[in-house]
A protein has these predicted regions:
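Hydrophobic alpha-helical membrane-association signature
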Residues: 41-45, 91-94, 124
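CoA-thioester-processing core
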Residues: 98-104, 112, 118-153
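Conserved CoA-thioester-binding segment of acyl-CoA-metabolizing enzymes
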Residues: 1-66, 82, 100
Length: 153
């Protein structure tokens, strides 16, 4: 099991686990923030996906999450702390690259969804090859209420 730490909370934002040969689980691990995609989380996902893409021994990638939610989308608190155009352009370019990588890796990607999956969190699910949702799973793109629209792949 490996993890990448969040500089804000010093918690592992992403946990990797091999449960059986050929299957790897990446678990989003910012449960107190509903697994919002912080800069650290996006970077950790990109690094993990780049590494996974080159592994012939892995056939299946499961995206999971700890806590009450799968993923609340971008970290709005972090976004509000940087209210300038260049920050948003960089953030969305980073997210777009990660989402594109997710769609292009050779492994089958399964999103294991519980709780809410909103905005970019809903995009994570949409970019998976297959989604398995619990009875309590909820999907939304509520950013339109803030003048935002999810436009990455």
């Amino acid at each position: 099991m490996t993890s990448t730490r969040d500089s804000q909370d010093d918690l592992p934002v992403l946990v990797q686990q091999n449960h059986s040969p050929g299957v790897l689980t990446l678990t989003l691990n910012r449960p107190n923030q509903y697994n919002a995609l912080s800069e650290d989380m996006l970077a950790a996902l990109q690094r993990a996906l780049d590494e996974i893409a080159g592994r012939d021994d892995l056939k299946v990638l499961i995206l999971a999450a700890n806590g009450k939610a799968f993923c609340a989308g971008h970290d709005l608190k972090q976004m509000r702390a940087h209210p300038d155009k260049h920050y948003y352009e960089s953030l969305f370019a980073t997210c777009s690259q990660m989402m594109l990588t997710l769609t292009k890796i050779p492994q089958i990607v399964i999103a294991k969804v519980h709780g809410m999956a909103t905005a970019a969190g809903c995009q994570l699910v949409a970019n998976a090859d297959l989604a398995i949702a619990s009875q309590d799973a909820r999907f939304a793109v509520s950013g339109v209420n803030l003048g935002l629209f999810c436009s990455t792949p």
